[in-house]
Amino acid sequence: MGRSLKKGPFIADSLLKKVEKQNTDNDKSVIKTWSRASTILPLMIGHTIAVHNGKTHIPVFITEQMIGHKLGEFAPTRTYRGHIRDKKGAKS
């Protein structure tokens, strides 16, 4: 179930202020954020936002197709290292 239209999309206040400040200054430097739950808005297009994945910040370049999605969707938190292989010559 999605968020109520009456409430509007969630975006962290600090992130919104940083994006708006960069838009007024015509600056496109990387913005670091821990807010994975923030929704991508049209005013973020063209910005690079470094989203925290629990260990490091992963840079995400915002495009038009990402609008409406959450920042956390583009910064995976788990690494898949493959299934464990059976030992050679092991008896079952």
UniProtKB/Swiss-Prot annotation:
An MF annotation (GO) of this entry: structural constituent of ribosome
GO cellular component, one term: cytoplasm
Segments crossing the lipid bilayer: none
Gene name per UniProt: rpsS
Protein name: Small ribosomal subunit protein uS19
Species assigned in the record: Prochlorococcus marinus (strain MIT 9312)
Family annotation (Pfam families): Ribosomal_S19 (PF00203)
The keyword Ribonucleoprotein is annotated on this UniProt entry: yes
InterPro entries: Ribosomal_uS19, Ribosomal_uS19_bac-type, Ribosomal_uS19_CS, Ribosomal_uS19_SF
Key words of the record: Ribonucleoprotein, Ribosomal protein, RNA-binding, rRNA-binding
Function: Protein S19 forms a complex with S13 that binds strongly to the 16S ribosomal RNA.
Keyword rRNA-binding in annotation: yes
GO biological process: ribosomal small subunit assembly; translation
Superkingdom in the source lineage: Bacteria
Family as reported in the entry's similarity comment: Belongs to the universal ribosomal protein uS19 family.
